[in-house]
Amino acid sequence: MKIAVLADLHLTDNFQTVKMPVLNWALQEIARRQCDLICCIGDLTAQGSDKQTAEILEKLNSSKVRFCSTPGNAELRIYGDGKNAVKFDVPAPEGMPVVLIDTAKDEPTAEELSKLAALPDNGGFLLATHNPVRNWSSQAQEAAKLAMQRGAVTALIAGHSHHDEADILRGLDPDKASGGVPMFSIMEQLPDGAWQRSDVTMPGVDPGEWSAAEREDFFRNIGISTMWEEIAALEFACKHNIRHVELRMGLEYASELPQAIEKWRKCCGETLSLHLPDLKLNDEENKLQKFADLAYKLGCDRVTLHVPKVTAAEFENVKEKLLERFGNDLQILLENNVVIGIENLHTTSNARTFETRNFGCNIEECRMWVELLRERFGNEKIGFHLDIGHCRNNAPISGRENLSDWYSCMGDLVNGWHLHQVEHKNGEFFNHRPLSGFYDKLISLGGLFMAQRAGQLKKAPMFLEARTWEGNVEAYCKLKDLFNK
């Protein structure tokens, strides 16, 4: 008896992302391995929209392998009344030793727990649920414990947390799966009734499976942000042959900076970028223009500039003024064909609505602004600078626009990147933490790797942008080790 367990794909309404190939691979692999049943344990959709629900169920119903299912919390995001979540409540076929417990609202109801009490002693069932049993209330955990003590349940499997443990699988999401590439588990019941788990991982995603030339081609795009340590950063770049450097600095700088830049250029330098201050309606100190002049003076090949510092609600009424100021303040860069990367922003805990959040937190607004700038100034050097941390720490937008959506929808405009991790601590999210691996929480680079290999992304400098220079050194050394394995 082989049961394939699928969890946590988070498919959005965009079926052109790399998540669809993940689902197709999983279903094909399950059929190839001749599994007896597919067991879906929640969050196969990103929000439980009509479109997402219909697509997932059509895929499952088209499979040659029967399926059972229980919803996850994501299936309730749009329809909290369970309109679509209930469609994922599909009991296991008769004779299959699987009991599904609905934990879409985190805690199982008394009715759900009664399923455990009804199981026969020594039945050897697999308890499959979305929210891990250890997260249940003590009373609910006791019900599961009793079922296991009498042999009614002999194995547990859950998802939700996007990482692997004995009774938890990280799941299918290439943007969120922590600890490795997209995967599913096969739970096989042995003749003695015990269960044995084996994990099946998606091939071709991890750089360790790429050719040496492909790894080198990707890694050569990795650069660093100086984070107010320009001289030390340029020396580090020379030592490690880092081709792309972004200056994060003030208007005043050390007298030896031009010489340090020249030395780096002769050593290995290809792309020098400068992070500019915000484009604002009122800039009495002409700060943006001064930084644009500095970029030209230092010989920068490109600059990074956030989307305008206005709310989403304000934008339509002030966009002409913003376009005019952009042209005036960045005139020297536009005239000299310097690449300009427009960077996305993110919501904050007290600014998440259209009326309060900054413009340029979603895909539509970012694309519109880049295209407006290109049309106004007739300049294809203006493109999109994709900050993956800003995409991830972007509630509630991040629920419907995952990283893979940004790759799919903005990849053709990309001319630069910011790479950093997001940390969740004490109920808050913090940006600009150093990357410590390919598959961290809360950002996994699996989707980025897949999108690059699928041809969705233009090659461009990828600047590591931790909060501190030391953090960027740490991240660079870690990534270098991983790519050289």
Model region roles, listed by residue range:
Residues 5-7, 37-43, 66-73, 101, ...:
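Active-site neighborhood of phospho(di)ester-bond hydrolases with catalytic His/Asp-centered motifs
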